[in-house]
Amino acid sequence: MATSASSHLNKGIKQMYMSLPQGEKVQAMYIWVDGTGEGLRCKTRTLDCEPKCVEELPEWNFDGSSTFQSEGSNSDMYLHPVAMFRDPFRKDPNKLVLCEVFKYNRKPAETNLRHICKRIMDMVSNQHPWFGMEQEYTLMGTDGHPFGWPSNGFPGPQGPYYCGVGADKAYGRDIVEAHYRACLYAGVKITGTNAEVMPAQWEFQIGPCEGIRMGDHLWIARFILHRVCEDFGVIATFDPKPIPGNWNGAGCHTNFSTKAMREENGLKCIEEAIDKLSKRHQYHIRAYDPKGGLDNARRLTGFHETSNINDFSAGVANRGASIRIPRTVGQEKKGYFEDRRPSANCDPYAVTEAIVRTCLLNETGDEPFQYKN
């Protein structure tokens, strides 16, 4: 398995410089979603002092023609800080800064899905929507070969790898542990991790987060994962079906509840929400991966713990359904439900917005409603 050239550099030499004092200055790494709707970009600027809140961070700009977001003849785009985290790579007082992207005319960039999502979340803030997202990913070498797999073959069939322990079952745990601790340091609301069904496939969970914070925390968790993998010389892919054949795909199962669902007899509200979702299946399929459903078509086959992309289904403890109601929720008659359709490479802003539009704003039809300002 191939690893990157950078991972073979002497990290001790780098540490000699990273241990130098930086005075009162602060390094702020600005992070944004590029024009693919999946990739992340970043660049760093120096601040004179440590910012206490995101509002103290200055707006910045970048060359959108190099990120698939504009043409070269009019390439300046704006970075507007919206969320701030501690930097686990440079450590305190340095910061990671998540940004929204705006075009030259101050309109949101096409892949700035946070802007409208924030507006939708504000409309239902009195219902306190909570989300938890289960991010699956696969570790790969720089040659595109799964981490730890035989160079000219396949590992043993699925079965012993899910939550597995041992060198022959868990591939790349060092990366998982490093990512977990880095997220905790940064202030990302990471709540767990586990090895998944396919060897070299892992999952981490983010949440519960209310409203727009779900997307903010998941995007930063993804960024941290990419940076950790960069240090180890490997790649984390969110491809929903990285290996064709009899291997599990990768999803981003999304758990959702409102205050009413979490209270006594909330199961009635959960069932009402699921009924609304059943009547808008194709709208959600289009929102649940960056290619309008084409990526998920490779994953949602009705096999390997997935539903069929063309059919809506729901059930208690059923991992082959579109919507799963956890058994404990069915017993306690309150709690949350799990939408198992989102792909691993989904935009969390698109997913959470779609759920709120259908379940709380009672939208119907195949297109989102355009609300007046």
Swiss-Prot record:
Could you say which residues bind Mn(2+) 1 here?
134, 253, 338
Residue list for modification Phosphoserine: 343
Concerning Gene3D superfamilies, the annotation shows: Glutamine synthetase, N-terminal domain (3.10.20.70), Glutamine synthetase/guanido kinase, catalytic domain (3.30.590.10)
Annotated binding of L-glutamate, by residue: 246-247, 319, 340
Q: How is it modified after translation?
A: Acetylated by EP300/p300; acetylation is stimulated by increased glutamine levels and promotes ubiquitin-mediated proteasomal degradation. Palmitoylated; undergoes autopalmitoylation.
> Topology relative to the membrane, per the entry?
Lipid-anchor
**Where's it found, cell-wise?**
Cytoplasm, Cytosol; Microsome; Mitochondrion; Cell membrane
Q: Does the keyword Coiled coil apply?
A: no
Name what cofactor the protein needs.
Answer: Mg(2+); Mn(2+)
**Gene Ontology molecular functions:** ATP binding; glutamine synthetase activity; identical protein binding; metal ion binding; protein-cysteine S-palmitoyltransferase activity
InterPro entries in the record: Gln_synt_N, Gln_synt_N_sf, Gln_synth/guanido_kin_cat_dom, Gln_synth_cat_dom, Gln_synth_gly_rich_site, Gln_synth_N_conserv_site, Glutamine_Synthetase
The reaction(s) this protein catalyses: L-glutamate + NH4(+) + ATP = L-glutamine + ADP + phosphate + H(+); L-cysteinyl-[protein] + hexadecanoyl-CoA = S-hexadecanoyl-L-cysteinyl-[protein] + CoA
Keyword check for Ribosomal protein, yes or no. Answer: no
N-acetylalanine-modified residues are 2
Where is each GS beta-grasp domain found?
Answer: 24-106
Modified sites of kind N6-acetyllysine: 11, 14
**Which effects follow disruption of this gene?**
Embryonic lethality when embryos move from the uterine tube to the uterine environment. Conditional deletion in the liver leads to a marked increase of plasma ammonia levels, causing increased locomotion, impaired fear memory and a slightly reduced life span. Conditional deletion in endothelial cells impairs vessel sprouting during vascular development due to defects in endothelial cell migration. Conditional deletion in erythroid cells causes ammonium accumulation and oxidative stress, impairing erythroid maturation and recovery from anemia.
Q: Which keywords does this chain's UniProt record carry?
A: Acetylation, Angiogenesis, ATP-binding, Cell membrane, Cytoplasm, Endoplasmic reticulum, Ligase, Lipoprotein, Magnesium, Manganese, Membrane, Metal-binding, Microsome, Mitochondrion, Nucleotide-binding, Palmitate, Phosphoprotein, Transferase, Ubl conjugation
Regulation (activators, inhibitors): Glutamine synthetase activity is inhibited by methionine sulfoximine (MSO).
Induction per the UniProt record: During erythroid cell maturation.
Q: Which residues bind ATP?
A: 134, 203-208, 255-257, 319, 324
Q: Which PANTHER family did the record assign?
A: GLUTAMINE SYNTHETASE
- Family designation: Belongs to the glutamine synthetase family.
Name-wise, this protein is Glutamine synthetase
Recall the taxonomic lineage recorded for the source organism.
Eukaryota, Metazoa, Chordata, Craniata, Vertebrata
Task: State the encoding gene.
Answer: Glul
